[in-house]
Structure formats: C-alpha cells, structure tokens
Amino acid sequence: MIKVKNLNAGYGKLQILFDVNAKIEKGKITTVVGPNGSGKSTFLKTLFGLTKIYSGEIIFKDKDIAKVPPHQKARMKIAYLPQTNNVFANLTVEENLKIAGYVLDKDKVKERIEIALSVFPELKDILKRKAGTLSGGQRQFLAMGMALVRDAEVLMLDEPTAQLSPKLAEVIFEKIIEMRDNFGLTILLVEQNAKRALEISDNGYMFVSGRVAFEGTAEELLNHEKFKEYSLGITAV
Amino acid sequence: MSIDLISMILLWFGLYYIVSLSLNMEFGYAGIPNFGKALSVLVGAIAVGGILDRLLMLYFGIGGDFITGTTYATSAINNLIASNPIVGIGILILAIILASILGFVVGAIFILPSAKLKEDYLGITLLAISEAVLLICTYNLNIIGGYYGISTPDILAFVSGEYRGWVFAWIVLFIAFLVYLFFERLLNTPFGRVLRAMRENENTVKAFGRDIMKLRIKTMAIGSAIGAIAGVLYSLYTVNIIANAFTRVDWTFFPFLMVLLGGKGNNKGVALGVLCYVIVKVLLDIYKYNIKYALGIPFEPVWLSYMLFGVLMLLILYYKPSGLIPEKPIITPPMKKKIMEISGK
C-alpha cells in the first residue's frame, strides 16, 4: 500500500534516514524495530510529512506523496499517532472524538464514534472527563479511537505501549490485532517491545543508524541473528 | 462625581470587553499569543482618522493640508450632526464597517510572516510588527496625524455635554453585547472546538486533516476586525486621535490580563475579568493621589496602576491560571438538544 524508495530525511540539516527502501502491505501489520536512535520514529514522522525530506519517494495509491503536507495526508486516510501528545488534554473525551470526525460528513461522524466506542468500550464511562486526566492506557485507547472515528486506512503507531504496564500493553496489542482483522487497517508499528510486537505482526523492518538493516516477514526477523543480538543487547564487532 | 464615575466604568468595560473578547478567541481559544493586539485597535483608529476623515474632506470639498483639512471637515460634519442625529448614527455605522473590513484584511496579512513560528517566537513577532506599525503612524503625519493627532467627528453632537458620556457608554455597551453574541454564536461550534484543539496540539490537528495556517489566518482576521471596532469607538469617543494612545500596555497587555483573570476560552469569564480590572483601574486612576496621602506612599502614585498590573499577573499565573471562571466544554446546538432530551426524561 505504501512504497518507500531511496528515502533520505532528517531535521533541518541533520540527516537521520539514509536510502531507506520499504513496503508497507495493505491490511497487514508491519513492525519497525531497532535500538534507540536508529531512526524508527523519524521514519514514521517522515511518512507523515513532519520531517525534512531531502530525496526519495513515498508512493501511496500510485502517487508520490513525499511533498504532500500532513493535513492533506490525513485527508488521504493516513493516521499518525505519536507516542505522546496524541490527544487534546484540555478537551473532554467526547470532544476529542468529535474533533476527529471534522473532516467527515456530519451523518457519518455519529456512526464512526459508535464504531470507535465498540472497539474501545472503556471510553464509554469517561466521555465527560478531560483527556488530560486519563491514565496512560485510557489515553492510548482514546488516541486509537480517534483514528477509528476518522475512518483511516493506514494507522501509524509510535510506541503505543511505552510507559504502560505489561498487562495493559497486552490489551493494546490485542486492540491492534482487532483493528487489522475487523477493519482491514494497514498498520505500521514502532515498538521498543520488539519481540511481542513482531509476534503480532505480519512483516518487520530492523533499523540501525538510520538504515534498513533487515527486512522480511516478522517470523524471519524474530529468528534472525541480528535481531537476537539486538534483543539481548549484544553488539557484534 | 459618582454618576460620572459609573459612566466611565461602563464605557471602559464596554471598550475593553470588545478587545478582550477578540483576544479571547485568538489566545484563549486558538492559542495564538497575539502580543500585537494593539495593532487591531490602532487599525480602527486608522479607519476613522485616515479613511473616514479623508472621505469627509472629499465630501465637503476641502483641500490642502491633511491635519488642518480634517479639522474643517469634522467641524462641518459636527454641525450637520447637531441638527440631524441620523447622520451621526450613519457615521458610526460607516466607521465600524470600514474598520471591520480593514481590520479583517490587516489581521489576515499580519499573521503571515509568522507562518512557521510558534509560542514565544510567534508572540514576539506579532508584538514587533505591532510596534513597528505604531511607530510609523506616530512619525508619519499623513496616516492619522502622527504626533500632532487629528480630529474625528462627534457622532453625538446632538447630545448636550453633560449627558454625552452616558449616551456614549450605552452605545459602547450595546455594541459590546452584540460582539459577545457574535462570539458565542461563532465559537460554540465545531469551529470553536477545532480552535481549542489547535491551542492544545497543532500537530494532532494537522493529523486530523486541518490546515493550521488557514485556521490562524481566519482567527486573526476575525479577531482583528472586532478589535478594530473598539478602536473606532475609542476614536469617536475622544473626538480626536493621537497615535501614542494605542500603546501595547493599554491595548495588548491589559486585555491579556483581563482574559487571564476572567478565564481564557470562556466569554462570560472574560466579562467578569474585564469588569473587575476596569473597576479597580478606574478607581485607582481617579483616587491615586488620595491613596498616596492616606497611605504615605513615598513615590509618584501614577505608577500604582502598573504595579497593580504586575502583581495581578503574577498572582493569576501562579495561583489560578485557569482564571475566575474556568472554561467548559463547547456545547454545540446538537449537543444542547441531546442534553435537553436527557434531562427531560
């Protein structure tokens, strides 16, 4: 669904990504793993248009969207959820969900909110609370619920389980699977919890120093020597 | 004395409420730190002194020097107004229309240089632009008479002097009420919610498909158009304009204090903030020398109002940053209907 070709990107004059080639398949979960500072989050930000692209192409539905600004990418049904700052803290949960629907037809918004609440029933009891008062898990539910309200086709998640307990992280992973299976979402996932993320994924990429060090199916990546070294914190010389 | 005091409080409440409501939309709702708010008020003065006065010169066939010419023109129109009150009301409406249009355009242009700026950088850029325009208007005699100033029509030339303050205060209050209704109607909508969202998190607003710059332009254009109305009213009240009357202290910083005091993102809260501050400030200005002698204050009491400003700002930001009346969720008409249904059951 999204093809990345020879992508070079960074922040201002600081280049982070070097000659990245990748393919995110429609209706699949693709996980990006790698050590801190490897460019995983920058990769997501670049796809969404929040970094400076020096060269390369991002092909989505047969069009190069590398130079398309974020708000137009959003209207192309691409949703990006940063690790933090992904909700409006001073607005209520209900208001957050409504705002997510502002690019849709009025009739459709109500329907989409009901769908979001069916996937995240935990939100029903807290609709009147300010988003800033939610726990970490509730906040992630809200952020992902907002993506569902928008009727997104591609969902890019940047470490959605960061700072959550293992039990809650597992719930998040289950929701991600549910969104892929029930709504056919294409999901691109950046996770520090690499092993578990790959276990729920279809495909995987390993980034090292801003380059793709390995790509393949999630299973292949799980069994790769490089990944084992990375998981154990061993650096081969 | 007390009667005049009340009319003065009402007048300043009305003027500052108009400015503060528009600042509340820009800063309280949209999160735009418009430290150049004084510019929109100055634009109202320019509409009256720079455009309306020229139209009057044209109408009465008066040529020659701008400053002198407008003196003759305003004398002529005042004579006309004295015998035809309708003309005065017409001048007021014309001035408001001119100012709103000019304010709208200037507001839209004013925000453009800051396309990539945020927060402090955005605020300081707007302040700098505002100051630059004020300096130009102060030293260029052909805009609003520079440091000499310029005459403006007395739209209440048909009212005797002793009642003029009262009548003008009620006109200002009426217009302030209309502005309040306008903002309540404009901001209790999905648009208002998007502005609040933009204040919270611009990247997430982009992520939901909205163009931040368009929202800023729209917000600043509307905010400046309304701010310019206050400039018109002030210029017509004083029946003259001098550029130095439109300083950042009076028309940017005081409104910020009033918005924060009353409660940003909340139009009723702003009313309370404006009322509290205006009462204290007017009383302080009038009785500052009585206070000096009563308390044995060892310095010039003219500084008391600035000290009050500083102390209040620190107290608000430290102890109650949400203001006297904190903001509430935006209730759009459909939500209101739903609430009525639920409570009706």
From Swiss-Prot, chain A:
GO BP: branched-chain amino acid transport; L-amino acid transport
Keyword Nucleotide-binding included in the entry's annotation: yes
Domain ABC transporter: start-end pairs: 2-234
InterPro entries (alphabetical): AAA+_ATPase (IPR003593), ABC_transporter-like_ATP-bd (IPR003439), BCAA_Transport_ATP-bd_LivF (IPR052156), P-loop_NTPase (IPR027417)
Gene3D superfamilies named in the record: P-loop containing nucleotide triphosphate hydrolases (3.40.50.300)
Gene Ontology terms, MF aspect: ATP binding; ATP hydrolysis activity
Record-listed ATP binding positions: G34, P35, N36, G37, S38, G39, K40, S41
SUPFAM superfamilies: P-loop containing nucleoside triphosphate hydrolases (SSF52540)
Keywords assigned by UniProt, alphabetized: Amino-acid transport, ATP-binding, Nucleotide-binding, Transport
Keyword Lyase: no
Record's function text: Probable component of a branched-chain amino-acid transport system.
Annotated family: Belongs to the ABC transporter superfamily.
Protein name: Probable branched-chain amino acid transport ATP-binding protein LivF
Gene name for this UniProt entry: livF
UniProtKB/Swiss-Prot annotation, chain B:
GO biological process: amino acid transport
CDD domains: TM_PBP1_LivM_like
Membrane topology label: Multi-pass membrane protein
Cellular component terms (Gene Ontology): plasma membrane
Molecular function via GO: branched-chain amino acid transmembrane transporter activity
Biological role: Part of the binding-protein-dependent transport system for branched-chain amino acids. Probably responsible for the translocation of the substrates across the membrane.
Database matches in PANTHER family: BRANCHED-CHAIN AMINO ACID TRANSPORT PERMEASE PROTEIN LIVM-RELATED (PTHR30482:SF1), HIGH-AFFINITY BRANCHED-CHAIN AMINO ACID TRANSPORT SYSTEM PERMEASE (PTHR30482)
Protein name: Probable branched-chain amino acid transport permease protein LivM
